[in-house]
Amino acid sequence: MRCSLTSMRTIERTTAFKRDFKREAKGPHRAVLDTDLRQIITALANDQPLEPRHRDHALSSNWKGYRDCHVRPDLVLIYRIDEDRLMLARLGSHSELDL
Protein backbone atom coordinates (compact mmCIF):
# COMPACT_ATOMS: atom_id res chain seq x y z
CA MET A 1 0.00 0.00 0.00
CA ARG A 2 1.36 3.43 -0.95
CA CYS A 3 1.36 6.31 1.48
CA SER A 4 -0.28 9.52 0.26
CA LEU A 5 2.81 11.47 1.34
CA THR A 6 4.79 10.08 -1.60
CA SER A 7 3.42 12.95 -3.70
CA MET A 8 4.74 15.52 -1.24
CA ARG A 9 7.29 17.87 -2.76
CA THR A 10 10.87 17.90 -1.52
CA ILE A 11 11.37 20.91 0.73
CA GLU A 12 14.59 22.88 0.24
CA ARG A 13 15.74 25.93 2.19
CA THR A 14 18.10 28.57 0.86
CA THR A 15 20.94 29.84 3.02
CA ALA A 16 19.10 33.18 3.24
CA PHE A 17 15.94 31.43 4.49
CA LYS A 18 17.92 29.55 7.16
CA ARG A 19 19.44 32.84 8.34
CA ASP A 20 16.02 34.55 8.28
CA PHE A 21 14.45 31.69 10.27
CA LYS A 22 17.12 31.92 12.98
CA ARG A 23 16.52 35.68 13.25
CA GLU A 24 12.73 35.31 13.42
CA ALA A 25 12.99 32.46 15.97
CA LYS A 26 14.53 34.99 18.38
CA GLY A 27 12.02 37.73 17.63
CA PRO A 28 8.39 38.52 18.43
CA HIS A 29 7.06 35.58 16.38
CA ARG A 30 9.04 32.88 18.21
CA ALA A 31 6.00 31.56 20.11
CA VAL A 32 3.96 30.83 16.96
CA LEU A 33 6.61 30.57 14.25
CA ASP A 34 7.04 26.80 14.37
CA THR A 35 3.34 25.90 14.26
CA ASP A 36 2.17 28.62 11.85
CA LEU A 37 5.04 28.16 9.40
CA ARG A 38 4.82 24.36 9.58
CA GLN A 39 1.12 24.45 8.60
CA ILE A 40 1.87 26.62 5.57
CA ILE A 41 4.86 24.56 4.44
CA THR A 42 2.91 21.31 4.81
CA ALA A 43 0.03 22.69 2.75
CA LEU A 44 2.34 23.99 0.01
CA ALA A 45 4.38 20.77 -0.13
CA ASN A 46 1.18 18.75 -0.51
CA ASP A 47 -0.39 21.04 -3.15
CA GLN A 48 -3.17 22.19 -0.81
CA PRO A 49 -4.57 25.73 -1.04
CA LEU A 50 -3.72 28.22 1.68
CA GLU A 51 -6.39 29.99 3.69
CA PRO A 52 -7.30 33.43 2.29
CA ARG A 53 -5.86 35.13 5.40
CA HIS A 54 -2.37 34.15 4.18
CA ARG A 55 -2.82 36.39 1.10
CA ASP A 56 -0.84 34.09 -1.20
CA HIS A 57 0.15 35.77 -4.47
CA ALA A 58 2.73 35.79 -7.26
CA LEU A 59 5.63 38.23 -7.13
CA SER A 60 7.15 40.23 -9.98
CA SER A 61 10.33 42.16 -10.82
CA ASN A 62 13.36 40.68 -9.01
CA TRP A 63 11.18 37.93 -7.56
CA LYS A 64 9.47 36.85 -10.80
CA GLY A 65 8.66 33.12 -10.58
CA TYR A 66 8.29 33.27 -6.80
CA ARG A 67 5.24 33.67 -4.58
CA ASP A 68 4.72 35.12 -1.14
CA CYS A 69 2.26 34.49 1.63
CA HIS A 70 1.72 35.95 5.07
CA VAL A 71 2.59 33.63 7.95
CA ARG A 72 1.40 36.46 10.23
CA PRO A 73 0.23 39.92 9.14
CA ASP A 74 3.79 41.28 9.43
CA LEU A 75 5.73 38.10 8.57
CA VAL A 76 6.10 37.04 4.93
CA LEU A 77 7.34 33.77 3.40
CA ILE A 78 8.80 33.94 -0.12
CA TYR A 79 8.81 30.59 -1.88
CA ARG A 80 8.92 28.88 -5.26
CA ILE A 81 7.15 25.70 -6.32
CA ASP A 82 8.55 23.47 -9.04
CA GLU A 83 7.12 20.17 -10.20
CA ASP A 84 8.68 18.16 -7.36
CA ARG A 85 10.27 20.80 -5.10
CA LEU A 86 9.22 23.53 -2.68
CA MET A 87 12.02 26.09 -2.32
CA LEU A 88 11.80 28.29 0.78
CA ALA A 89 13.66 31.44 -0.25
CA ARG A 90 13.17 34.13 2.42
CA LEU A 91 11.26 34.88 5.63
CA GLY A 92 10.75 38.30 7.19
CA SER A 93 8.80 41.53 7.21
CA HIS A 94 8.02 43.43 4.01
CA SER A 95 10.68 46.00 4.86
CA GLU A 96 13.33 43.36 5.66
CA LEU A 97 12.67 41.67 2.32
CA ASP A 98 12.37 44.90 0.30
CA LEU A 99 8.87 44.02 -0.90
Regions found by a protein language model. Name each.
Residues M1-P73, I81-M87, S95-L99:
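Basic, Lys/Arg-enriched alpha-helical interface segments
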